[in-house]
Amino acid sequence: MANRLLLLAAFLVAALPSQAQFFTGLRGTPYAGITNVNYSPAIAGSPWMVDINVIAIGANVNNNYVGLSRYALFHSSAFSDTNFQQNYLHERVNGLAKSGYAGLQVQGPLSFMFQFGPKNKRTLNAIAFSYHGNFISNVDNVTEVLARTAYHGLGYDANNITHYVNTELSNANLSIKSAAWIDYGITYSRVVINRRENQLKVGGTLKLLQPVSGAYGYVKNLSYKWTEYEQLNIYNTQVNYAYNNGMITSQGNSDIPAYVKQGLQFKNGPPTVAVDLGAVYEWRPDATKPNHEMDCKCIEAEQVQRYKIAAGFAIMDFGALRFKRGDYSRNFTADIRNWDVGGADFPDGLQSIDDTIQSRFKVQPGKKYFTVWLPTRFNLFVDYNIWKDFSVNFTALISQDMSPKRDMLHQVTTFSVIPRYEIKWFGAYVPLSVDVMGNVGLGLTLRAGPLIIGTQDLLGLFVKKHLYNADIHAGLKINIPYHRTCPKNGDIRFSKKG
């Protein structure tokens, strides 16, 4: 039983919210192009005439409870240690509820953007098409007593730590949700104001959503008591429970390729839509000042378009996924006494859980479909050009489960300061970030020609004793910049000094 509960704890950690921004270092920079369409759809004004994605992937996990020893990260033999938990895992005990996140996003090949406009306003409009494979899993609001009891396993050791036996316990708003989906988006952005030193650009993305897999569970008020080490009472607790039809289980589809194919054919749920909206203001105090003396030098497009301060706001992923409910996934009321969970066994995975629910609890009739809301978030940034090619970006990602039923996916509210150096074919970005779960990260992203690679946190690799979060992102693109604007014969650009 202790081993099963340890696996449960490991699942909570792996599925638990993180610093879940993808490509954090590129947020706010105009050089991100199509990569930033997931941060703000206001992409007009980019230095790139055309930006085509070959492949881009971002993955991260994070939790605020169990840390992995940095030693184990670099020594695979540690994972075969019979005392792995004691030697290489570390609990963060602070009395707070435990949460975590796992996320993956892949921007599909040939996602692209291009800009067009009059000769003297070549970046007036931008159009993009992009598609992404997405996966997010959240576990939220696990009380420290429940988390530690699961981590140490029912019995003397856990009780000696948490004193869970013969104690009236509760857990409010406990939730777990997970979804995989594909989105196909068309983006339009335009510079709507361009007067002297002031520029305002806006953008929007309309997305078609393809649900692949989804599940959630939510307990508003869990009330329970352990009368013995492995004997449980649960008191009149309402549980919302759903997973999509065809979920991989002995009662559904055990053929993974067939299951994925079913999802891609909209058999797991109908298509729905979502929208992104964004705006960026730029202040260019030098826009009306002559900046070229009597010469015939060509002017780089990005030199003409440089701003001193930019500020942006976007609301992303406003929409929801709809799934066909599995036949055995129903809301239920748990009200049971003296349940010997030590003898509980789940040999058939999800089917065994369903069988237990059907036999022990009062199951309620369910609707044919259930909803999982997308991770709606608010992105804000202020970007300041310090000097020439050196800038610093202040960004906030605000995301939380705002649904009363706790069926909304979410990222983790994170605040970042990102110093950077960038020119057309190279950029170095150093994000310093802190999230609401108390995790601090110092990362590095490099952009070298068409290649982007980085991580949100290098501290875990070189400084931190234990890792609570990990992130990696990489991309390969085809960038086509604007050609230089050069004077023609008889068109000599000059201005007087002063």
Each model region followed by its residue ranges:
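Subset of outer-membrane beta-barrel
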Residues: 21-498
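Bacterial Sec-dependent N-terminal signal peptides
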Residues: 1-25, 498
